[in-house]
Amino acid sequence: MDRVELHDVEYGDCTVLVGQNRQILMVDCGSVSRYARRGEEEIDRRFNEIFSRYAPAAQRQFLLTHYHRDHMSGFLKQVKKDPGYFDRVYLPALPCDKRGVNPVLEFAVFAHFFAVPQSDFAQVNTTCLRIFDALNDSVGADRIFTLGGGDIFTFDGAFYEVLSPARNEPFPFDAILTEAVENLNICLSSPFHTGRETEFLETKDAFVRLYMQCQTAFAPSDRATPGRRRILLDSLRDLLGRMEDMRSNLAHSPAAPDIQDILNQSVVRNVYTETQNDLSLVFHNRRSRGPSNLDILMTGDVSDEVLRRISGKLFDGYYIVKAPHHGTESHFSNVIGDLAVAHLLISNGDYHAGGEISQRYIDMECIKHCTNAGACRWRDIAGGCCNRLQRCYEQPASGSLTLKCAAAAGERRTPCNIYVFVCAVVRRFDDIRG
């Protein structure tokens, strides 16, 4: 890995690992914001500039940590506009509970077919249902890969290991979500229904089972044959289409109001959203020797609970750590705070429901690289960056204050090889190479 580039997409995420051989791995690309506040231009323009920057790359890979708008909206628009842009796309595999039930998929199906249309895209996001179909029509089935805990993938000649969520182990889902899913199924299970409720339940169950088979068939290891993958995708599309055909009938079902009552409970919606966060792909590099400046930990939007569960798999320290969930206090973890971290990446922005950057990250003895200071109370109070009195050991005079960084004097190349793009115009891919 040659460098890491962090892009300001307001309240969203877009982190790009740039390889030595003109390869890139883009981890997430999305935002809940409509505008990039500094210039008030539409956020789509920012996405276009980002994708234009990496157009000259020899190979472009994309990894989606989880199915939330602030991590995938730009990506979905790009693959629709330019299906061949990414050579490989990694998707998160959604795990089951100890009973073999996948409550996230189950809830998503009910929300997709019964919920009243919402303006808040991130609240009950059901993109996971159509992701295989959408990417099959755009990037093509051969470029789709699913990842789960224990899987290994490669980038720029190095191996990266997925730490969470485990692919073959039950996930400890919140009881609020599992009970909600049970109640949703009960609503359609009455023998007194005279519509297509029973048919919908059977089709839904078949869809979820087939979806799980697709996740296995598209894994990096034990990958199914192209013919088998094509059959699975065609069957998945057929089942989704059959449920769509039942939509108007289901809208008049006596069970519909009860189902909508469950879906509209704020506590249930919030748990579903936080569960999606906790199912983020967490990954790090595999060391070939000892610690190095190639050590990186990417955390998606996971909570402290998830990080504590996988803490035994983490290194004692990392050169780069991506702060989970935009560096907010709600997702701060002492697991991160106790690591020896050289550089911390924080992607935050202007969003009323987002949250400020945690003071506990600011207190960490590492260099913080932030896309947007608008959510930083420290900067508002102190009138400057918390890095001013930090020492950077990547500078030629090791341990010099960050104020003496060559990049601060206008040099194109930073000693740490970490770049934050916050301006409206993003330079071309080759402009930073030393």
Identify the residue ranges that each predicted region occupies.
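Flexible, acidic/histidine-containing loops and adjacent segments that form or flank the divalent-metal
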Residues: D2, K77, K81-D295, G384-G434
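Pre-active-site segment of Zn-dependent metallo-hydrolases
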Residues: R22-F62, S73-D82, F173-E202, V302-G317
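Structural motif
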Residues: Q23-L25, A58-Q61, R88, Y160, ...
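Well-ordered, non-membrane alpha-helical segments in soluble/globular domains
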Residues: R37-I50, F75, F107-D133, V306, ...
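Metallo-beta-lactamase
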Residues: A58-D70, V321-H325
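C-terminal regions of proteins
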Residues: P324, T328-V341, L345-G434
